[in-house]
């Protein structure tokens, strides 16, 4: 059984983003071809849709319970450069900095639209990337603390309004091909443009939580969807 699981994981890694419908279907068909049977629910778990968490926020915004590409709330998931919908896992042969100028996101001169929205493209309606204003609303209406979930370090945001919470792992970020600050910091893209070179993001470090920070658009950050 363990060999079966490893093969399914290998297929997912090799043939695309786990959250893309075409990749999911290909993986299931590939598994059926190899084993002569339908894939078991372990594959479905890997590609499970996020759950919308209602924190009672004034705007009515609901937050996903996990990062894009994560099968569980505590997992890192995929990393995205700003304005691009193709995510990458840490350790893959992809250079976020060198390749950025040739991506669709590099050509954006305003906020991210739906065509370039990693949440909308990978998860479908009604999911979108959060704006910097939605990050501000999250921070203003929640308490937050550094904590662990099933052994993963991160920060839990708990609503001051209804007590519901979401956990954001310390996924770190990718600069070029190097993963940095994994397990100590979190960086989450918004859809809001900072400048020609920067995008706004939620950043949290040992020094505090910053809902409207901005960083180089070519960095590989996490994406947490909203609806």
What are these language model-derived features?
Residues 49-51, 55-227:
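C-terminal, surface-exposed recognition/capping segments
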Residues 11-12, 55:
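A short beta-strand micro-motif
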Residues 25-28, 136:
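Generic structural signal for individual residues within well-ordered alpha-helical segments
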Residues 16-24:
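Charged, low-complexity interaction regions
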Residues 1-11:
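Short amphipathic alpha-helical heptad-repeat segments
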Residues 32-51:
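Low-complexity, Pro/Thr/Ser/Gly/Ala-rich linker/spacer regions in secreted
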């Amino acid at each position: 059984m363990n060999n079966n699981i490893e093969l399914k994981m290998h297929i997912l890694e090799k043939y695309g983003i786990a959250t893309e419908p075409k990749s999911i279907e290909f993986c299931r068909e590939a598994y059926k071809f190899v084993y002569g049977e339908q894939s078991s629910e372990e594959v479905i778990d890997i590609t499970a849709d996020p759950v919308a968490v209602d924190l009672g926020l004034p705007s009515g915004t609901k937050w996903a319970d996990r990062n894009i590409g994560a099968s569980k709330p505590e997992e890192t998931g995929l990393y995205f450069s700003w304005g691009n919908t193709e995510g990458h896992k840490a350790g893959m042969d992809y250079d976020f900095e060198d390749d950025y100028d040739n991506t669709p996101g590099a050509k954006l001169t305003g906020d991210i639209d739906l065509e370039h929205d990693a949440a909308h493209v990978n998860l479908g309606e009604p999911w979108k990337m959060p704006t910097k204003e939605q990050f501000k609303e999250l921070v203003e209406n929640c308490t937050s603390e550094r904590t662990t979930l099933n052994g993963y370090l991160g920060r839990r945001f708990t609503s001051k309004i209804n007590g519901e919470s979401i956990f954001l792992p310390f996924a770190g970020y990718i600069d070029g091909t190097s993963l940095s600050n994994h397990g100590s910091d979190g960086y989450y893209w918004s859809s809001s443009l900072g400048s020609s070179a920067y995008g706004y993001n939620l950043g949290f470090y040992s020094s505090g939580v910053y809902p409207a920070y901005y960083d180089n658009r070519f960095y590989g950050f996490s994406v947490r969807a909203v609806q």
